[in-house]
């Protein structure tokens, strides 16, 4: 199987950026969002292995849940259809930068302050992942990038777990390749927790400070042995310029016993910040040669004084004894595993076949179940089946079943859940809610809820869509949201008087109105100014209504009050306001002697708008 040049009609694959234990990473172009991304694709030779296939998919989901500025973001996951079957991939943030491994190999050790800042950011990323239940398991300089803007980015969350949990012999090299950063518990094959990542990050800090990892050997086995048995040389003895306070932080992170390490990455970060600001860390100070000489000379000159170091030595001996017991337990465990393997081989090839009880692995992760069965000497094969109650990648049952007695070396079929059965969501558009539920139920779906959304008047009370949408596949246990039209959305018309047309339309857009017409009206307001709307302001109408904007022609002036004025005075005043029309002189009226020849009546009245070429009627007193 080869990797196709396009994935899901969206991602154009470019150059290969690198290879991992189970994947290859390509530079790619997201043609939908027009941005560069990095795409991790499961290796073609592993895509047909159900264990790797399911674990890669699950780890992709875990990684996508980690949204943190110091963690390479996961944008999308999916599967590309190839001639040989589905090929899963993960779409990630493309980081333009270099890994710590490349930086140290090119430039050598980093200044302590810079190293502290980088690892402190990495601590934040790891602490966030631990709080979300994800252990990295493969912290190393190659998995920490520094971007072109000096941002720290931790990569490959969870992928190392897929390799470490696998029983495939072909993956041995992938584990050995990171032996220089394995925690002692990883090297012994014990279960690990967040403190294992703290140890590995301590190895990273050691290397970027000194230019070399804490342990170097001729083979991965010898390096792993040193992680379990040997104490690291303090970084300050490997490279100058490193303070004893920073030594203390590194060596506490590299404690053999997890109980003696930082219990969280946040604790390690807090000590790094203390050292960065010139304060002593909480980690115990590492004695220099001068300190030891001073203590010895002090002890020689105080004969007869009670020795407190005897108790310390005794405690240390007890600790070492405990460590020795732990190492013997590990040796015994290894011998036990070898014994089981030898017995299984004898039963298979050289002796009589014996019956072995099938362990109960129901509900376990498939990779763990495979290990448990193969440790009993069984051959295994996996069969994927949908199941509505067992989570994906977990065991539904085995054939033969749990506790059955079968011959050693027989094949056990492991039925692995792919999650609930997937069905295509039918199109229920334009149906009412009841009929839509009936159609969805007939397609196998069981849970529904209604949501209302604005619609055209014709679709009021009708289905306008579903979530997931029609023709998409969904688990039959998922809740299908049926979206029912509630008719046109209504809004209150805002007051836009006094605004020019363009501004008025933008303000109406904010309220959801998008349809407009204009009507020019006589008005003394400036030309082009909105003097009103139809429907009027504050009216509540559907947002798809046409809003008429009444726009001033600017062809009027405001009629002044001419009462008591002689015509000789009134006319110049009107002309000054732009009036070009003619006077309609009405019959004189009886207004008393004092109003003789003065304006006693006018039309239009004072304050009204008058067209500049309009007729004005005046009546004078007699």
UniProtKB/Swiss-Prot annotation:
Residues 11-273 form the Protein kinase domain. Pfam families: PASTA, Pkinase. GO terms for cellular component: plasma membrane. The chain crosses the membrane at residues 329-349. One of its GO terms (biological process) is regulation of primary metabolic process. Residues 352-418, 419-486, 487-553, 554-622 form the PASTA domain. One of its GO terms (molecular function) is protein serine kinase activity. Residues 350-622 are extracellular. Its main location: membrane. It is a single-pass membrane protein. Residues 381-404 are annotated as: Disordered. ATP binds at residues 17-25, 40, 93-95, 140-143, 156. SMART domains: PASTA, S_TKc. The keyword ATP-binding applies. Belongs to the protein kinase superfamily. Ser/Thr protein kinase family. Homodimer. This is Serine/threonine-protein kinase PknB. The lineage of its organism: Bacteria, Bacillati, Actinomycetota, Actinomycetes, Mycobacteriales. The gene is pknB.
